[in-house]
Amino acid sequence: MQDLDNLHINFSPSSLWVLNAILGFIMFGVALDLKWIDLVQLTKNWKSALVGLFSQYILLPFTTYLLVLIVQPSPGLALGMFLIAACPVGNVTNLITKVSKGNVALSIGLSSTAHLLAAFVLPLNFALYGNLYSPTASLMRQINVDGKEMAWLVFLIIGTPLLLGILCQRYFPRFTELSKVWFNRLSMLFLAFFIVAAFASNGKVLVDNVQKVAWLVILQNGWALGGGWALGKLFKLPEADIRTITIESGIHNSGLGLLLIFQFFDGRGSMALVAVCWGVWHLISGWALAWYWAQRSPAV
């Protein structure tokens, strides 16, 4: 699968700026829904909160490393898997949790915490496992990834819009209340348009090569969902909390991952394919779970 690294993904500097803006717009919309009470609620449900954070920040990156050791993909694919595992949760987890009859308050608290800590946790986990696996360590030395620069970019993309959204909520509460639904809808619409445009520019490349990567993405996503579910069961959490942690573990911000790939890895084909496949598959698996759980009320 080494030839995947040489794939050319048509993604111009202007496209990178557009993706930056869309992700910032999405995070601003997320912040309009963020309330400090959501974070306070985590302390009241501390056991489930700790299990959820452990699943996201420690279990998934570690099990991804084990998966890479077992299947031994090309260094580019492995780096893509490590990066996605390190990315914070996707912004649709709260909605999927609601449809799944999970604990929405827990979902909001976990996803908010994940976004607030992303600038620190993402570069740390990526550097740890990227350097721990020798084939990717060699590749990272060749590329010379700057962890501080990555952390700063993640903060700009996620932290700045979050801060602006929180300030907007604090000083312009009426505007926030009237606009937050539209911000969320428009951000999803902009992202959908961007994905369609990107696919139109790279359709043949993606169609010809997606089967080489899809099985790895499905396997990793299955491990993520299964790991979150198993951890919740192990700690005997309420069923609604288990559903929430499962979803929070399996839905990741692949858009952020794709942006970092083009910013720091010159759009390396194998890494980009992992991020693109994740962006599609985690929605399929997440909504499939939501449909299944929507038919079944959680045990009390």
Language-model features, listed with the residues they occupy:
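Alpha-helical transmembrane segments of multi-pass small-molecule/ion transporters
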Residues: 1-300
